[in-house]
DNA sequence: GGGCGCCCAAATA
DNA sequence: TATTTGTGCGCCC
């Protein structure tokens, strides 16, 4: 389920439910997701209290005295907090039970996600990540400067997590539409002015999506703890043959780097 | 830098 | 019933 806004909403939903909660039991319902889930979490996290929850890129970082639990939701992961007696659902692979009688469960049908642990909070997977798109370091000159001499297409470029994190397939399409840039354009062949516009569009699109997701938070701990995708805000993604908001021509679908791209041939140049 | 493949389920043919 | 497609991303060539 996750792109950056969905992970951010998950984080915000978790904060009031699990901060300061003490772990009574850790359950691994299977040994691995994308990678092995460390078995020693069962002993390491026992009786540990959750201190903070942060997000870096699409990783959730849940901090304990003993170290940091690193969770990635992959393509289909979601987290919910339920009463401990709630029957376990299919694909709920990992569970943290708390002394207050609730349980945080990770559901991930495709199992592309990950549950990892780091004593000092650092991790190989976090080392080579680019800047956060909603922070000030992602400024108007950043993409322009990073894109010089890049021959790959601009969509792939903004989806490169070594450059900027958290821009997935949906919001890459949406941002390029909002900025009126053709996704097939070579990254190194886009002007400083257009990158400035694109930068603001990425920030706007992500911020809007987080805002839309915020409305789902009151239901976060209910039966459906999955905030889902905020489809009401999408202008091009999944909109093949639908009408462009601006010029009324048809949105088309192409394939780039084995991923679907949706765009308006007339508006995006 | 491009493409593969991990895995399951829903949509489509 | 069989095939295609999908919100991610590390790894291999």
From Swiss-Prot:
SMART domains: Fapy_DNA_glyco, H2TH. It catalyses: Hydrolysis of DNA containing ring-opened 7-methylguanine residues, releasing 2,6-diamino-4-hydroxy-5-(N-methyl)formamidopyrimidine; 2'-deoxyribonucleotide-(2'-deoxyribose 5'-phosphate)-2'-deoxyribonucleotide-DNA = a 3'-end 2'-deoxyribonucleotide-(2,3-dehydro-2,3-deoxyribose 5'-phosphate)-DNA + a 5'-end 5'-phospho-2'-deoxyribonucleoside-DNA + H(+). PANTHER family: FORMAMIDOPYRIMIDINE-DNA GLYCOSYLASE. This is Formamidopyrimidine-DNA glycosylase. Belongs to the FPG family. Involved in base excision repair of DNA damaged by oxidation or by mutagenic agents. Acts as a DNA glycosylase that recognizes and removes damaged bases. Has a preference for oxidized purines, such as 7,8-dihydro-8-oxoguanine (8-oxoG). Has AP (apurinic/apyrimidinic) lyase activity and introduces nicks in the DNA strand. Cleaves the DNA backbone by beta-delta elimination to generate a single-strand break at the site of the removed base with both 3'- and 5'-phosphates. Keywords: DNA damage, DNA repair, DNA-binding, Glycosidase, Hydrolase, Lyase, Metal-binding, Multifunctional enzyme, Zinc, Zinc-finger. Binds 1 zinc ion per subunit. GO terms for molecular function: 8-oxo-7,8-dihydroguanine DNA N-glycosylase activity; class I DNA-(apurinic or apyrimidinic site) endonuclease activity; damaged DNA binding; zinc ion binding. Its cofactor is Zn(2+). DNA binds at residues 91, 110, 150. A zinc finger (FPG-type) spans 235-269. Pfam families: Fapy_DNA_glyco (PF01149), H2TH (PF06831). HAMAP family: Fapy_DNA_glycosyl. SUPFAM superfamilies: Glucocorticoid receptor-like (DNA-binding domain), N-terminal domain of MutM-like DNA repair proteins, S13-like H2TH domain. The gene is mutM. Its EC number is 3.2.2.23, 4.2.99.18. It comes from the Bacteria. The lineage of its organism: Bacteria, Pseudomonadati, Pseudomonadota, Gammaproteobacteria, Candidatus Pseudothioglobaceae. GO terms for biological process: base-excision repair. The active site is at residues 2-3, 58, 259. Monomer.
């Amino acid at each position: 389920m996750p792109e950056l806004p969905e992970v951010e909403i998950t984080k915000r939903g978790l904060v009031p439910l699990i901060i300061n909660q003490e772990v009574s039991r850790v359950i691994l319902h299977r040994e691995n997701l994308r990678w092995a889930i460390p078995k020693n979490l069962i002993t390491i996290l026992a009786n540990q209290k959750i201190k903070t929850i942060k997000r870096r890129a699409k990783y959730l970082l849940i901090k304990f005295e003993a170290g940091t639990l690193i969770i990635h939701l992959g393509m289909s992961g979601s987290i919910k907090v339920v009463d401990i007696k709630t029957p376990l659902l299919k694909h709920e692979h990992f569970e943290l039970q708390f002394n207050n009688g609730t349980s945080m469960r990770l559901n991930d049908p495709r199992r592309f996600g990950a549950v990892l642990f780091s004593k000092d909070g650092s991790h190989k997977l976090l080392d080579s990540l680019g800047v956060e798109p909603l922070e000030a370091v992602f400024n108007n000159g950043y993409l322009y400067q990073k894109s010089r001499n890049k021959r790959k297409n601009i969509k792939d470029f903004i989806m490169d997590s070594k450059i900027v994190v958290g821009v997935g397939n949906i919001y890459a399409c949406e941002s390029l539409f909002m900025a009126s840039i053709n996704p097939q354009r070579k990254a190194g062949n886009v002007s400083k002015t257009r990158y400035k516009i694109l930068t603001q569009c990425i920030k706007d699109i992500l911020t809007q999506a987080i805002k839309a997701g915020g409305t789902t938070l009151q239901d976060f701990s209910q039966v459906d703890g999955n905030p889902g995708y905020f489809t009401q805000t999408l202008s091009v993604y999944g909109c093949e043959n639908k009408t462009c908001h601006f010029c009324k021509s048809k949105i088309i679908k192409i394939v780039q780097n084995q991923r679907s791209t949706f765009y308006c041939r007339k508006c995006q140049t």
